[in-house]
């Protein structure tokens, strides 16, 4: 039919126009979409479907009592009253803060995990009430570079804490920085009383630091605020790589037993706020022999007498002590607050007069001896008659003895008297 024939071509043209419009729209969408959202021409349909259906990998779990940041690779478990190290620490952790908890004991293998915490580099365990750290407590941490055990009252620090639990094999520790500030236990928790307990505590710390070859790579060591009286003789012998040593705010009265000769890389030594009174020539010579060291000595009670002369001369010539201009005398009273660099040889004398306390002691002793002497004389006076009679008896006895002696001598001297004596005897 004519009508049907006329509608056919117009309908076909309409469908063709719609198809062209659809192709144009599809091309515009393809051009505006990101190239990464479309599969490449070399990707098969099966691969495209697989990639479209794949899910992102699940995030690592975070312990319930902690805060985790995978981007910063940091885990913080702060003030959570934890009794032990969380078991489900994420393996990506590089910085771990376990502070302000209630972990009194840190046993061997406390950080052993599967998979291991191979990237853990910074570990802060300060303020956890730790009393005991076992041998090999930090094993299985091959990347550990900084360890902070400050503000824990350690009564039992194993000699193999940093060396590993296998005591027959000395395993080098990866540690570069070790912070042990204020780890001294309270006085009532020290063994064998106060002084003996301090000596035992110093020996315990020294044993942990010199265990085998464990810490020979250590660069930074802090031992501030531990009430040390003396440094153990071999405390620093196994730390040849040490660059920074912090001993401030202790009670050090002398460095006689310490040796710094082996610390050839030492750059800074902090001895502020101790009880040092004078430094001897042996210590000064060791410091002068270290090429790069800087020693800080402020806030010590220096005694400015004749024993200080060598130290004052050394201070005036050396550049080892950056704060030498701030060093002042604490004793004797007449020299208080005078700068060490301002002293001359005439100022540094040993006063022959005794200290006031010693003078008082001698006066008291003299009074006691005088009283004893007075009592003795009084006893003699009260017994003067008896003493006089006793002396008369002694005199009479001596006289009788001497008369008998003279009589026998006269008889023996005269032969006639001798014969007479013999005949009379017969």
UniProtKB/Swiss-Prot annotation:
The gene is Tpbg. InterPro entries: Cys-rich_flank_reg_C, Leu-rich_rpt, Leu-rich_rpt_typical-subtyp, LRR_dom_sf, LRRNT, Wnt_signaling_inhibitor. May function as an inhibitor of Wnt/beta-catenin signaling by indirectly interacting with LRP6 and blocking Wnt3a-dependent LRP6 internalization. Residues 32-361 are extracellular. This is Trophoblast glycoprotein. Residues 289-352 form the LRRCT domain. Its main location: membrane. Glycans are attached at residues 124, 166, 281. Highly glycosylated. One of its GO terms (cellular component) is endoplasmic reticulum. The keyword Membrane applies.
């Amino acid at each position: 039919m004519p009508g049907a024939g006329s509608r056919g071509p117009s309908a076909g043209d309409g469908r063709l126009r719609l198809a062209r419009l659809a192709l144009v729209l599809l091309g515009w969408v393809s051009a505006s979409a990101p190239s990464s959202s479309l599969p490449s021409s070399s990707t098969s349909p099966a691969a495209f479907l697989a990639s479209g259906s794949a899910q992102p990998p699940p995030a690592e779990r975070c312990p319930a009592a902690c805060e985790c940041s995978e981007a910063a690779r940091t885990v913080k478990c702060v003030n959570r009253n934890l009794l032990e190290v969380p078991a489900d620490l994420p393996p990506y952790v590089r910085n771990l803060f376990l502070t302000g908890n209630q972990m009194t004991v840190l046993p061997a293998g406390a950080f052993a995990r599967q998979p291991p915490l191979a990237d853990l580099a910074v570990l802060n365990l300060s303020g956890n009430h730790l009393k005991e750290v076992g041998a090999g407590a930090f094993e299985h941490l091959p990347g550990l570079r900084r360890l902070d055990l400050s503000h824990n009252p350690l009564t039992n620090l194993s000699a193999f804490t940093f060396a590993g639990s296998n005591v027959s094999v000395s395993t080098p520790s990866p540690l570069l920085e070790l912070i042990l500030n204020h780890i001294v236990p309270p006085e009532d928790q020290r063994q064998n009383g106060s002084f003996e307990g301090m000596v035992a505590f110093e020996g315990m710390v020294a044993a942990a630091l010199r265990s085998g070859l464990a810490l020979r790579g250590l660069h930074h060591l802090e031992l501030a605020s531990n009430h040390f009286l003396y440094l153990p003789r071999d405390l620093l012998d196994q730390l040849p790589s040490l660059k920074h040593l912090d001993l401030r705010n202790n009670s050090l009265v002398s460095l006689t037993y310490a040796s710094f000769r082996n610390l050839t890389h030492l750059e800074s030594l902090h001895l502020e706020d101790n009880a040092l009174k004078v430094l001897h020539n042996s210590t000064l010579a060791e410091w002068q022999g270290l090429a790069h060291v800087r020693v800080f000595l402020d806030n010590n009670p220096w005694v400015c007498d004749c024993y200080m002369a060598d130290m004052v001369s050394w201070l005036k010539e050396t550049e080892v002590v950056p704060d030498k201009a701030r060093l002042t005398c604490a004793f004797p009273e007449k020299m208080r607050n005078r700068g060490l660099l301002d002293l001359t040889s005439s100022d540094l004398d040993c006063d022959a007069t005794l200290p006031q306390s010693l003078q008082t002691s001698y006066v008291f002793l003299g009074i006691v001896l005088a009283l004893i002497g007075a009592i003795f004389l009084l006893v003699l006076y009260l017994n003067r008659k008896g003493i006089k009679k006793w002396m008369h008896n002694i005199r009479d006895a001596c006289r009788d003895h001497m008369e008998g002696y003279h009589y026998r001598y006269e008889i023996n001297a005269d032969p006639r008297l001798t014969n007479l004596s013999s005949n009379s005897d017969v």
